[in-house]
């Protein structure tokens, strides 16, 4: 876990988002839960792209209190406490990659399954209230998958239902998954993570 506690020269005024575009219509139509008939949920073998509607349905089913699912240019100040899922493209675009964050008083807990620093406008939004920003620095998702929406949902699910301080929950969540070690091919670890995430959703959702 890393923390940005002050306006520092960390970001260099640039968006570091280099996420792979996984869909040109994520905002409206995904290949996720809406394509899964209820009678076949247990047969799901891969977590695919989710639209904003998919995400809302799943979060509602899992009883995750959600402030909303937004494109990155749709936020307004003041930012209220709560759970958010955000797409890293603007509202006039089709959508690229889902991330999640929690605002709790003066703290922001930001999770990107690719472990990429948030775009500049989100950094500015978070810091507008002099918030502390906690973010993950280790990649969990394979670049060959489109499961970012599922990663975002499970992050909020874990943070909401687990015990302990939010800082402790954030640390424990990141410890659950494999991370690339020196001289190790990243996809080996990431594929294990994808399999674990699918197993988790089969237990908490596809059952």
What are the language-model segments listed below?
Residues 5-8, 12:
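Residue-level detector of alpha-helical secondary structure
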Residues 83-160, 164:
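Cysteine protease-like catalytic core of ubiquitin/ubiquitin-like
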Residues 54, 121-125, 172, 196:
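Exposed alpha-helical structural elements
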Residues 13, 22-99, 103-108:
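Cysteine protease catalytic domains with a Cys-His-Asp triad
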Residues 133-206:
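C-terminal folded domains that constitute the principal catalytic or ligand-binding module
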Residues 1, 28-30, 36, 40-43, ...:
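Terminal export signals
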Residues 54-63, 126-130, 156, 205:
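Hydrophobic, Leu/Ile/Phe/Ala-enriched alpha-helical segments that form helix-helix packing faces
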């Amino acid at each position: 876990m890393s923390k940005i506690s002050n306006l520092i020269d960390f970001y260099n005024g640039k968006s570091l988002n280099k996420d792979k575009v996984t869909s040109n219509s994520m905002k409206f139509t995904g290949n996720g839960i809406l394509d899964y008939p209820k009678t076949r949920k247990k047969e799901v073998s891969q977590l695919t792209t989710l639209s904003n509607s998919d995400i809302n349905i799943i979060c509602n089913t899992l009883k995750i209190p959600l402030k909303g699912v937004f494109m990155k240019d749709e936020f307004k100040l003041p930012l209220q406490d709560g759970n958010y899922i955000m797409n890293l493209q603007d509202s006039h675009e089709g959508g690229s990659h889902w991330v999640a964050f929690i605002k709790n008083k003066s703290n922001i807990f930001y999770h990107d399954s690719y472990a990429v620093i948030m775009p500049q406008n989100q950094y500015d939004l978070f810091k507008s209230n002099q918030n502390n920003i906690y973010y993950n620095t280790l990649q969990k998702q394979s670049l060959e998958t489109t499961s970012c929406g599922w990663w975002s949902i499970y992050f909020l699910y874990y943070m909401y239902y687990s015990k302990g301080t939010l800082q402790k929950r954030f640390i424990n969540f990141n410890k659950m998954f494999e991370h690339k070690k020196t001289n190790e091919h990243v996809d080996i670890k990431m594929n294990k993570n994808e399999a674990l995430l699918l197993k988790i959703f089969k237990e908490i959702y596809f059952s």
